[in-house]
Amino acid sequence: AHLYDDTCITRALDAGVECVEHGNRMSDETIARIAKEGQCVVPTNITYDRLAKEGAEYGLPPESVAKIEDVREAGLERLDKLYKAGVTVGYGSDLIGGMHPHQSGEFTLRGQYLPADAVIRSATVDAAKVLRMEGEIGAIAPGAHADLIVVDGNPLEDLSLLTNQGAHMPMIMQGGKVKKG
């Protein structure tokens, strides 16, 4: 469910929602509850980052761009809290229109707040948990979908290798078939 503050998130959790999309304005108490109950959060912070920078180009008035900046900052501040609380944080794709090419910018944006391995895990094993597809995606294992990328460098040292629409990926394999390389 796409939710931002405690009132909405609490209501959704009480109703059985298992994954909060965004959650930019959730409190420490709500983060603790999500961690305790084993629920997931998919922040997709890059959406707010790009809208804060390009919102005027998309026709948003200055007041909306300012509000988005506040929401962006709040969401980024939550990343470390979610990580330290042990919340499963997935990697989302909630971008619209012309912003979609910026999706992979989420890697470097999160990397400013989290260890690289946690950022990569959010797009692999944690994303699989969010989608209830553990062992099928986000893993190199017998019976998994065999979606793999070969990266030109070490993304644990440089998360930007995972950005720019595959520019640093000489080989991309999906479902066991080479799509690039």
Named regions from a protein language model:
Residues P155-L161:
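Short, Lys/Arg- and Gly-enriched loop/turn segments at beta-strand edges
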Residues E63, V71-P155, P170:
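His/Asp/Glu-enriched, well-ordered alpha-helical/loop segment
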